Amino acid sequence: SSFSRERNYTLDYALMTDTDWNKEPSSLSMTLDNGFKNFTDLKLKTFYRTSGRDNQITRKYKDSPYINMPKGYGYEVNYMNMSGKKYKYMAGFMRRKGEEYMSALGWNKAYDFLFEYTPADSISYSIFYQDLREKNWLNWLENNLLGTYEKRQRLTVAGINWFKGDKHELRLKAQMVAFTARTPKAYLANN
C-alpha cells in the first residue's frame, strides 16, 4: 500500500519576449508535489533559466534598455500539514540564483512559515513570515547608474477570515515589510 493520496509532476518551459518581440531568457522547471494519506504535502521544485537580456531592471531606459544577465537556477522545498481539524502549518526553504522568471546576479535564500488556526467553521486566523537574503542584489538607481547590495527582506502577514453562510465573507490582512540594502557597490553593465 502507498503512503501517497496523490502525486503530481509538472514540467514547465517558458519562452519570453518583450513588447518589441526581442527574445528574453527562457526557463525550464520541474515540480514534484506529493500529497500523503495523513494530509501532509511535500513539494519539491527546481528550475533553470538561460542567460540573456533583462529589460525589467532598467525599465527600457533609452540609454540602457536592457542588462545582460547570467543564467539562473535553484530549488525550493515546501512542507504543509493540514491534518489537524483546527490548525494547519507550512514551512518552506528556497535557494536560488534569480527566479524562474526573473534574473539576478547573486544567490538568494529564503525560508518561510505559515500557521493557520480555525477555532470554528466561520472564522480563521493566520500568520505568515518570510526572511529572504540576497547577495549582489542589482538595483537600477537612475539613468545608467546601477548598484549591487546585500539585501535582506522580512515579510510578516497576519490575517482574519470570517464567513457567514455561503454569501458573506470578511477578510482583514495586515502586512509589514522590513527591507535593508547594505554594502553598496557600483555596477557597470555590459550590454
What is the role of each PLM region?
Residues 1-191:
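Exposed, low-structure sequence patches enriched in small/polar residues
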